[in-house]
């Protein structure tokens, strides 16, 4: 095993070869799941991928196509209601 693969930053994947041997393949780990910027809940619709993998995806597959995709739907509604209420109070 190469010294660079001894650290746990590489994921170990056990693969059975056509000859019947079991060998170890090393892969980079996937990043953590995206979380809401306000409440911290995990976000749906955002894939877990390394930057190299994310670069290959189209823009619509990287994040939801709605206002404030970095917030969960509950927090997004709350923020939008606050913005609308503040506009109503001004006008």
Curated annotation (Swiss-Prot):
Keyword Metal-binding set for record: no
Keywords for the protein's UniProt record, in alphabetical order: Ribonucleoprotein, Ribosomal protein
Family: Belongs to the eukaryotic ribosomal protein eL34 family.
Protein name stated in the entry: Large ribosomal subunit protein eL34
Disulfide bonds: none
One GO term describing the cellular component: ribonucleoprotein complex
An example molecular function term from Gene Ontology annotations: structural constituent of ribosome
Single biological process term from Gene Ontology: translation
InterPro entries cross-referenced by the UniProt entry: Ribosomal_eL34 (IPR008195), Ribosomal_eL34_C_sf (IPR038562), Ribosomal_eL34_CS (IPR018065), Ribosomal_L34e_arc-type (IPR047868)
Organism this protein belongs to: Pyrococcus horikoshii (strain ATCC 700860 / DSM 12428 / JCM 9974 / NBRC 100139 / OT-3)
Residues covered by region (Disordered): 48-69
PROSITE patterns linked to this entry: RIBOSOMAL_L34E (PS01145)
């Amino acid at each position: 095993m190469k010294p660079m693969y001894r650290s746990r930053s590489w994921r170990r994947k056990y693969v059975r070869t056509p000859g019947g041997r079991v060998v170890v393949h090393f892969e980079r780990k996937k990043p953590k799941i995206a979380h809401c910027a306000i409440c911290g809940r995990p976000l749906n619709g955002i894939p877990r991928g390394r930057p190299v993998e994310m670069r290959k995806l189209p823009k619509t597959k990287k994040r939801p196509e709605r206002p404030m995709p970095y917030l969960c739907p509950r927090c997004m509604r709350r923020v939008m209601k606050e913005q609308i209420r503040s506009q109503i109070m001004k006008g």
